[in-house]
C-alpha cells in the first residue's frame, strides 16, 4: 500500500501532524517504538487515578487557537499548577511570590520583600555572572538561591551550580503578589480522563503500529527514491521523524547530550491523601529525588487510595529515555550541524522535542506541528 506520510513517533507532534494530514485527505501510517501511544504525555489508570507515567504534564497556553484545538479533543478541568517546595522540613509556595517571602522572612509587604532581595543582591556585588550560581544570586539573592534554587538545579543537571553556564537561568520569575499560580498563561488545565484519550482521538481512524522502531521497519529504495517497509508491502513519499535527530543519522557527527529521568511509582493503599498537593519539589541536594507527584490531585480525586511517583534525574546513556536536551554551546553547535544535514533532505521532516533538539511545552508542540502541516500544504 502507498502512503503519503510515514510518521515516526505517536507522541503529540506526530499525532497532531497525522491527524491534520488525514483530514486533508493524505494517507498516513504511524509507527511507535514504545508499546503505547502519546509519548511522554501518556497517562494510564490505576486505582481509578490517571497516572502521569513520564512526569507531571500540565497544559497551559496563551495561544487561544491551540486552546480551542485541544478542547475539541478533550474536556479540560480547571487545575491550576501551584507546586510547593520542601527544604529541610520547611514548606514554601512556588513560584517565588509574596507567600514565599512572608514565610521566608516573616514580612508582609512587597516593599519589604523587594528591599530584602535588593539588599542581598547588592551585598554580593556580582557585575558579570560567570556561572549559574552567580547568575541566580544576581537575580534573587542568597536566601532564595540557597533554599529553593541551588540543590534542585544541581540534582536536575547532575553538576554543581558553579560548573553550569549562566545562560541556563535567563530569568527567575519573582512576583510581588500573593499568588501561587505557577503559569502566567490565561488557559490552563488537564484533560479529564488523562492525555492518552486526547491522543487516541487525534489518531482515530489512522493505522498505528506499536513496538515498531524506524530502523527495523523502514528503508530507502535507491532505485525508486521512495521509502518502503522492509517487507516491501508499503511505500512512503515522505517521512516525519520525531525521534532523536542524531540517531536518525547514526551519530555520524557525534552524539547529542540529554538528561534522563527515573520514576519510582508507589501505590499507597488505604491512604487517601499523602501530601495534599499534586507536586512537591525537594530542593535540598541531600534528598535524591527532585519531586514527588501525587497524581490524584491533578483531577481533584477522592479515591480511598493514592499513587505517588518520585522523580530522579540522571545522566542519559543510549537505551535510556532522553527527556531534556542539554542546550549548551557544544550541543547547540552539534545540533546545528545535524540541522544542516536535515535541510538537504527532500522527503524527510523532523519535528518535536527530539527531532528538533529543543525543550517544548505541549502547546508549542501543537503549534509547531500545525505550522509544519501548513508549510507542507504551501509546498
Residue ranges and their predicted role:
Residues 47-123:
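Dinucleotide-binding Rossmann-like beta1-alpha1 core, especially the glycine-rich loop
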Residues 6-8, 31, 233-246:
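Short hydrophobic core segments
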Residues 19-47:
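Glycine-rich FAD pyrophosphate-binding loop
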Residues 3-30, 373:
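N-terminal Rossmann-like FAD-binding beta1-loop-alpha1 element of flavoenzymes
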Residues 3, 25, 206, 236-237, ...:
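Short, well-ordered alpha-helix to beta-strand connector turns
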Residues 19, 23, 43, 204, ...:
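Short, well-ordered alpha-helices that flank and scaffold nucleotide-derived cofactor binding pockets
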Residues 237, 247-379:
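C-terminal segments that line or cap access tunnels to active or ligand-binding sites in enzymes
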Residues 88-92, 99-236:
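Active-site/ligand-binding neighborhood in enzyme catalytic cores
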